[in-house]
Amino acid sequence: MAQFIDRRLNGKNKSTVNRQRFLRRYKEQIKESVADAVNRRSITNTESGEDVSIPTRDIKEPMFHQGKGGVRERVHPGNDQFIRGDKIDRPKGGQGSGGSGEGEASADGEGSDDFVFQISKDEYLDILFEDLALPNLKKNQVNKITEWKTHRAGFQTSGVPSNISVVRSLQQSLARRTAMTAGKRRLMSELEEELERIQRSEPPQIMEEMRIKQEIEELRNKIDSVPFIDTFDLRFKNYEKRPIPSSQAVMFCLMDVSGSMDQATKDIAKRFYVLLYLFLTRTYENVEVVFIRHHTQAKEVNEHDFFYSQETGGTIVSSALKLMHEIIEARYPLGEWNIYGAQASDGDNWADDSPRCKELLSNKLLPYCQYYAYIEITRRSHQTLWHEYEKLQASFDNFAMKNIRSVEDIFPVFRELFQKENA
């Protein structure tokens, strides 16, 4: 009786390889769906995956079929109503069967639902932050950020077909066949020598000769039954991620919490910073984040207070920039750290303070920052703070300004600010 041995190493996830191939094949469609999902779901919800939909037309496989037109005769099974030459009336109500669903009629006679499937939390975040990086990251004296690079690392017994090593697999096949047939070949060689001796002997030993020939035939069949290649022989090129020397960095997050920032504007700012925080903590293992909230006064706070504190007041933006400069001087030596800043505000500021903000940025922050991004969240026309900051763009390539008008603008703006230079 035949015995089947399951040597698959994926365990319960026997379709893992197929799933990974599918995600690579429809990468662009999945990225578009994930970008749309960012605006639909709570940005703080990272404990679950996401339902991704792909239009059915994008996943259709190419196929050979008969073209339209021409004269053809077909035999349809089960026909007991028509004979050759009969004409069949068009069904009433259009091309498709009548439906009772609600909604407006369509000009097209047929269609299909999108293909919907679930991606995991890790897959969701990997796709979300793909092709993003901190701009202008440079190596400094002390390296703490752990970045990874893929290297060849020998062979493994499982993997995707594209990584299969033909030479190593054939070597394993030869070794297995040699080990499994060596004893049988040795015994068959001995029997052949015995058969040759018996055939030369007198008188002839017919029965003994037939017995030996039968044993030789059985051994030959057993040797031939050993498969040339088996799944056990397959070897795949193995790749592993190894840490590479990089640089340590600190990101300053400055958020305006003054009275002019209504709840909707604050929510957009928090969503942007949560997205930034997830990106930094997932992409860079040891990057530090400094949270600063400000109204008339600026204060360094922890992560929880930054996102959930209800404190508010007037508006003096320069207080946050001044505090950022003080923290840099006290804790982050310029020769050892890559310094980044991200500032979010609705643009309202005390008129006399806006020139002061421009001066602080141009003299004390931008010359030492790798990158500084200013996000203004407003649907109104820009005020003095925006116009003062605009003067800095001509002088500093490491300074970027973007306007967010609604929740839908958050992710596109975020990608523009942190797109990889070579992506």
Swiss-Prot record:
Q: Which domain of life is it from?
A: Bacteria
Coiled coil location: none
Q: What InterPro entries does this protein map onto?
A: UPF0229
Please note every region of biased composition (Gly residues). 93-102
Name the segments for region: Disordered.
62-112
Q: Where is the composition biased (Basic and acidic residues)?
A: 70-92
| Entry similarity comment | Belongs to the UPF0229 family.
Q: What is this protein called?
A: UPF0229 protein VC_1873
Q: Which organism is it from?
A: Vibrio cholerae serotype O1 (strain ATCC 39315 / El Tor Inaba N16961)
- Tell me the organism's taxonomic lineage: Bacteria, Pseudomonadati, Pseudomonadota, Gammaproteobacteria, Vibrionales
